[in-house]
Amino acid sequence: MDILSSQANLAGYKAVIEAFAFFEKAIPMMMTAAGTVPAAKVLVVGAGVAGLQAVATAKRMGAVVFATDVRMASKEQVESLGGKFLTVEGSENLETEGGYAKEASEDFKKKQEELLSETLKKIDIVICTALIPGKKAPVIISELSLIHI
């Protein structure tokens, strides 16, 4: 495993562990005589190495996990880990020949913002791992959308 992948793997794992440490409710669903406690809902934005590790870790700990990515190949990977993949309506595959994400069009970004804004209304924890190689990490969730959490 190369250095970047190994560090991304650890970052995805640690992001979940730290997020759960700050979360003030139970993570897995619990059914007791007193009632049912619903599972925490986690959204992972970006399903590369770090994102997939975050999906796997959150799922293993009992959360309901949603994930999104601009690369269509990541849909199968997310679902194989037990996550639910969120697809932007009319989305285009934004994957380079090397398998990395590339910059999205303004129209795509608007549709993505609408999808995430609606999704955030039912999410407890958000983990952002989206990255475009050689560029600053994209701002995918606006401050206005964060109000819904």
Language model segments and positions:
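Glycine-rich phosphate/diphosphate-binding loop of Rossmann-like nucleotide-binding domains
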Residues: 30-119
